[in-house]
Amino acid sequence: MENIIVTQVKSSIGVKKEHKLTLHALGLRRTGQQRKHKISPQLQGMLNSVRHLIKVEKA
């Protein structure tokens, strides 16, 4: 499995509640925070739903 680094680049203020919950599930609480994850189909769906708020890089 491949690892990725997810960074929150935009604030969650004013976004849909579902998107806020997705960011929290990814472990992102504030702008600029980073988390390392292993790629899975479930994670891909979560990243796709908040793609306008995050940046994804290969680890």
From Swiss-Prot:
Q: How does it assemble?
A: Part of the 50S ribosomal subunit.
Which GO terms of the cellular component aspect does the record hold? cytosolic large ribosomal subunit
According to its UniProt entry, one GO biological process term is: translation
- Read off the InterPro entries from this record: Ribo_uL30_ferredoxin-like_sf, Ribosomal_uL30_bac-type, Ribosomal_uL30_CS, Ribosomal_uL30_ferredoxin-like
Could you tell me which PROSITE patterns the record lists for this protein?
RIBOSOMAL_L30
Q: Name one GO molecular function term.
A: structural constituent of ribosome
Instruction: Tell me the protein's name.
Output: Large ribosomal subunit protein uL30
- Keyword Ribonucleoprotein part of the UniProt annotation: yes
What's this protein's family per the entry? Belongs to the universal ribosomal protein uL30 family.
Which HAMAP family does its entry note? Ribosomal_uL30_B (MF_01371_B)
Which organism is this entry from?
Leptospira interrogans serogroup Icterohaemorrhagiae serovar Lai (strain 56601)
Q: Gene3D superfamilies in the record, alphabetically?
A: Ribosomal protein L30, ferredoxin-like fold domain
Sorted alphabetically, the keyword list is:
Ribonucleoprotein, Ribosomal protein
- Gene from which this protein is expressed: rpmD
- Report the SUPFAM superfamilies cross-referenced here: Ribosomal protein L30p/L7e
